[in-house]
Amino acid sequence: MNLGEKLAEGKTKIVYAHPTDPTLAIIVHKDGISAGDGARRHTIPGKGALSGRTTANVFTMLNRAGVATHFVAAPEPSVMVVYRCAMIPLEVVNRRIATGSYIRRNPDVAEGTRFDPPLLEFFLKDDARHDPQMTPDEIIAQGIASADEVEQMASESRRVFLLIEEAWAAQDVVLCDLKIEFGRDTSGRLLVADVIDNDSWRIWPGGVKERMLDKQVYRNMPVVTDEGLEQVRRLYEEVAQRTDAWVNQ
């Protein structure tokens, strides 16, 4: 499809202006995968289309549930049309199961501890500083978001988590945690934005960590081989296929 000017490019996607509508943008998913704030980077042919397919499925489900997201359409597997947003530089994380960075930061908490309700955390998007955690008061004081926006991000992120958790639970998959982002559209409305794909969560079939289907498999590899990358591609394909069921019921 036709693209406008390039607005931004990250490790896994490129954002373009819409060629005719200034309220829209176009996201093109790349085949890149990275970990460690970009210290480890590889290319997996076809990953962009699989990530785009998963993201489109997730956002379609959320839109149907009445969540305000930036997603408009996915004309191609690796392409999304979205409402153009000024992104808020925060990762909003909800955790059901203690694992990953949480237990490294909180060694007194046993891995597998269940949080009910889900535990909410905010992180500043800053690779150079390794995405430092922020409190709501710090976010407000630094002018990153208003108090009302922080409250809205907290409530909407939990709603999104619970919807996705329920969808995964129907397939006997435990959603351990979920990272999402928000942006303001051209009218100032706060929307769930960016992408939600297999890089955004930890998912354990049957609640068994060793059966994980997500990006953590790539993070955990001591050495990345072509065979390892193919294993990761197959996992992303499985997740895309599984999320197809969320919108094709």
Curated annotation (Swiss-Prot):
Its EC number is 6.3.2.6. CDD domains: SAICAR_synt_Ade5. Belongs to the SAICAR synthetase family. It holds the Pfam family SAICAR_synt. The lineage of its organism: Bacteria, Bacillati, Chloroflexota, Chloroflexia, Chloroflexales. PROSITE patterns: SAICAR_SYNTHETASE_2 (PS01058). This is Phosphoribosylaminoimidazole-succinocarboxamide synthase. One of its GO terms (biological process) is 'de novo' IMP biosynthetic process. GO terms for molecular function: ATP binding; phosphoribosylaminoimidazolesuccinocarboxamide synthase activity. Pathway: Purine metabolism; IMP biosynthesis via de novo pathway; 5-amino-1-(5-phospho-D-ribosyl)imidazole-4-carboxamide from 5-amino-1-(5-phospho-D-ribosyl)imidazole-4-carboxylate: step 1/2. It catalyses: 5-amino-1-(5-phospho-D-ribosyl)imidazole-4-carboxylate + L-aspartate + ATP = (2S)-2-[5-amino-1-(5-phospho-beta-D-ribosyl)imidazole-4-carboxamido]succinate + ADP + phosphate + 2 H(+). Keywords: ATP-binding, Ligase, Nucleotide-binding, Purine biosynthesis. PANTHER family: MULTIFUNCTIONAL PROTEIN ADE2, SI:DKEY-6E2.2.
